[in-house]
Amino acid sequence: MASISIRCPSCSATEGVVRNGKSTAGHQRYLCSPCRKTWQLQFTYTASQPGKHQKIIDMAMNGVGCRASARIMGVGLNTVLRHLKNSGRSR
């Protein structure tokens, strides 16, 4: 039986990562014991993937319109607007 080591996206730990149930869509969730963060490897909605927020902000800073950003990224217009609205808050 092959084992796959899962790395925590927050603290990069491989030891202490355990399975932590499933999401409502049936995707496996993981828990990092050292930092107590939870995450899943598969996303039901593409706007939840890591890095999407920063790509939307970068496109806006380079002059790409909201509708064009939504079309290119494959997310809804309201999602782009929400990311831009929340980008001014502390991250």
Curated annotation (Swiss-Prot):
Q: Name one GO biological process term.
A: DNA transposition
| Swiss-Prot/TrEMBL keywords | DNA recombination, Transposable element, Transposition
Tell me any Pfam family this protein matches.
Answer: Zn_ribbon_InsA
Q: Does the keyword Calcium apply?
A: no
The record's family statement is: Belongs to the IS1 elements InsA family.
Task: Quote the function comment for this protein.
Answer: Absolutely required for transposition of IS1.
**Protein name as catalogued:** Insertion element IS1 7 protein InsA
Species the sequence originates in: Escherichia coli (strain K12)
**Which gene is transcribed and translated to give this protein?**
insA7
